[in-house]
Amino acid sequence: MEKNIAEGMATAKSNPRVLIFAPCGYAALGLARLCESELESQVIGTPQTLPHFLETMIESKPDMVICGIDPRANVLPQLLNMPYYPSCRYVLLTDAESVALSRALQTAGFYAVIDKSMPLRKLTGVLRQALVNPSSGNIRRNARFYLPEERYILGALLNGERLALIARNMGIPYRSVSRYKHTALRRAGLKSINQILSA
């Protein structure tokens, strides 16, 4: 396995550009040092607010994005609807493992959702593998991933909006909103929105 990864790194883009979003400055510094020393990557930014992170992401189009945040801090809707670039790998570090959260975000295009307490060597291996593995391509043309409408609706539901309000804001029938909700949950292998909320 290590040989395959090493061979892949040799053919991968040299000095991949990594963007780190971690509101905790110490966490951001630790991740930056890890990326530069172990992954031979270029850290292009460590924004600590969501608006700055999204702005930097759009401007720089990184090769990998690492979000070292607690997804329960009312940012799940934004994570589901982040700008997506087919050549970029998205990794989320969380405070605790959750199958439901992993399924929800991997169906949104995240490469991995991992517990930040995992051993450093294992974390390094996951990040290295993320840079080596081929991307999923255009998620808007892949049936494994949410449709744009499904992303928006899941994000709105996680924000506490009701289906009727979402339908009015989108200008589509209530029944269509309900259908998008259920197809989104099925894609992620989930039964209800509460599985994500309780993660």
Please annotate each region the language model reported.
Residues 132, 136-140, 190:
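Charged, solvent-exposed alpha-helical segments that act as regulatory interaction surfaces
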Residues 139-179:
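Helix-turn-helix DNA-binding segment
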Residues 126, 180-183:
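Residues within the DNA-recognition helix of helix-turn-helix
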Residues 1-135:
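N-terminal regulatory/sensing modules of transcriptional regulators
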Residues 185-199:
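Basic, Lys/Arg-enriched C-terminal extension of HTH/homeodomain DNA-binding domains
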